[in-house]
């Protein structure tokens, strides 16, 4: 059973425990309807994947909770909570539907925070916070960095960390970005084995590649995508300026 399948069962139990009507509507809007300005505002850098269309932000609303999740498969979904609890988790789009809904539900229950992406100058502030956080909690580790989060990569590189970065975007692979070489995501497992710690986008949980990071090293997830899953499964997570 995958982590998301287990989460689906747990979410069904949460719904039952709260006596929710299984026919209650969940509205999900893909980031095609969230402009880059709505999703991330006007950050100081222009190389975020949200700004160049390589990733999109899916947003789910349940009652007063709003949850977001990155995906590379945008689309629309409108259905009931029961539909989400029984959705087949066989594509990145459907997994993103489930994860963003989980985030919205957990936020509605006030069981998690930072389920909405930071905006404007906040991504830069987040990145500036990261090196000190790593030093305080892990010293000066070798870091496998999964996903292209340019401000974070730049901050860690400038701070002198031994860093190996992987990405799935062919436009980045083999290039020097943010002062460091960008490797193919097919090397995730090798880099996780090499590193002392892994810093990973929560998108690996949506695209179902998280298992390759399990190399006996601490895995710390960053960002909004993993908000609900981190709370549900006690996964280490950082999201300094999420809303």
Regions found by a protein language model. Give the residues of each.
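Electropositive, gly/pro-rich neighborhoods at or near active sites that engage anionic ligands
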Residues: 1-150
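Short, hydrophobic beta-strand segments that form beta-sheet elements in well-ordered domains
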Residues: 143-147, 162-167, 199-200, 218-223
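Histidine/lysine/aspartate-rich catalytic loop segments that bind and position anionic ligands
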Residues: 148-182
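Short, acidic/turn-prone active-site loops that include or flank metal/cofactor-
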Residues: 167-171, 186-188, 223-228, 243
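Short acidic low-complexity segments
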Residues: 182-192
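An anion/phosphate-binding loop that grips the pyrophosphate of nucleotide cofactors and donors
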Residues: 195
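A short SAM/SAH-binding and catalytic strip from SAM-dependent methyltransferases
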Residues: 201-205
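C-terminal functional extensions of proteins
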Residues: 208-243
